[in-house]
Amino acid sequence: MEKITLVILAAGMGSRFGGLKQIEPIDPEGHIIIDFSLFDAWRAGFRDVVFIIKREMEEEFRECIGDRMEQYFHVSYVYQDLDRLPEGIEAPEGRTKPWGTGHALACCKGVVNGPFAVINADDFYGHTAFSEIYDFLAAQTDESKYACLLYTSPSP
């Protein structure tokens, strides 16, 4: 079976939050939300993780998350740099911020070379979500098949 990679979008600016919310503890024991996602991902079968981060947050991110996870996963880092754009595309003069999710995933070219799932570093998904997407990807033999896990929300 081809390796299945979990790609984690962790380069968010944190401007509304006021800091790196990816590494902010959410309980008295000091767990961060990504701890729960990675635990559930490991239980589902993921063993390869790619963190998409900003280059300037690498040291703090590795200390808080990456180094701990290397005992469970093969961990890679991709930088969402403004100069890493698809061929023929240039950033407008004066632009300092990277683009969003599409740009982040384009930066994975050459690092992710098979089936993969994508999550946000600061969202909670639960074990079922990871199991369902992993099982789908593991069973898939048709490269033209894709999946998106969606949740229904109760009406307000």
Predicted regions, residues:
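Short phosphate-binding loop-to-helix
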Residues: 69-114
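A short, conserved beta-strand element in the Rossmann-like catalytic core
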Residues: 14, 124-126
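N-terminal glycine-rich phosphate-binding loop and ensuing alpha1 helix
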Residues: 2-66, 75, 131
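Conserved small/polar residues in nucleotide/adenosyl-binding loops
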Residues: 151-156
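Residue-level signal for inorganic ion chemistry
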Residues: 34, 108, 122
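Short catalytic-loop micro-motif centered on adjacent basic/acidic residues
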Residues: 48-52, 120, 147-150
